[in-house]
């Protein structure tokens, strides 16, 4: 709701750059509560803010007041009354308006686009959980692979991305909050088309806030988020388990691994009951995958025999899965259990 032609032109130009549609409402068409609440963002001038403030409209997010000059005291008062989060002088603060409309458009898409989150953890050390997490990420149409084991040397080594430019966990100065997925994606390395947030070759610790923020950004971006978890139940690990649509417990097919899976399963289900088992061969004593699942008390999602020459491949450029490989087939079966991402809609500014 802008009466100044110059401010209207500024808004139209910024909105076109962001990719949102603007609906202009003038003084002859007072805003209704429905229109006020339905728009992805509301942009007002001083007069419109004063008018909407007198209507006692409900408080909402993404309300901005634009001015062409230094904001007067009366403008700030009108902005506070209407519940605006920003008072922006144009064109000097155009960048802030761009960010505000982009965030509003992304928020409007949240209900339509929602990626799935899968957390992968080993029943015991050396179970192959990290490898299976990489296989899931490679088998997904678009994935974010999140390394949550700060003492494992970096999952980027498993995808051949150790020299790829981009941020790793220690590079992120992040406490939590809401992140823009496009910005996250642009900052991360993408070896073989997978966005990877990896650890490094030096130790560090992870807090729950940044982990939750990164997972949430990927989910809102509509990608499949694959979290590789350590067997230590830290706050960061529990944040990923809480956020997961599916927790995958990976176990070798031997007696000791079977016992370890049975020990780990109730701990995991107490945090997230959506737990399934993947059993990896070989089976030196003839134990069957279904028997491991019965002992662990966990539904069997997939089983697979040992993949030949896997260790050699990992030493020379990381995991590269052929579509018909046993790892890829098992990964597709697990991905088939996840909820499908919806389709989004474009945001609208009023």
From Swiss-Prot:
Disruption phenotype: Essential for growth. InterPro entries: P-loop_NTPase, ParA/MinD_ATPase, Ssd-like. One of its GO terms (cellular component) is cytoplasmic side of plasma membrane. Induction: Induced by albendazole and thiabendazole, which inhibit the GTPase activity of FtsZ and probably septum formation. GO terms for molecular function: ATP binding; ATP hydrolysis activity. Was identified as a high-confidence drug target. This is Uncharacterized protein Rv3660c. The lineage of its organism: Bacteria, Bacillati, Actinomycetota, Actinomycetes, Mycobacteriales.
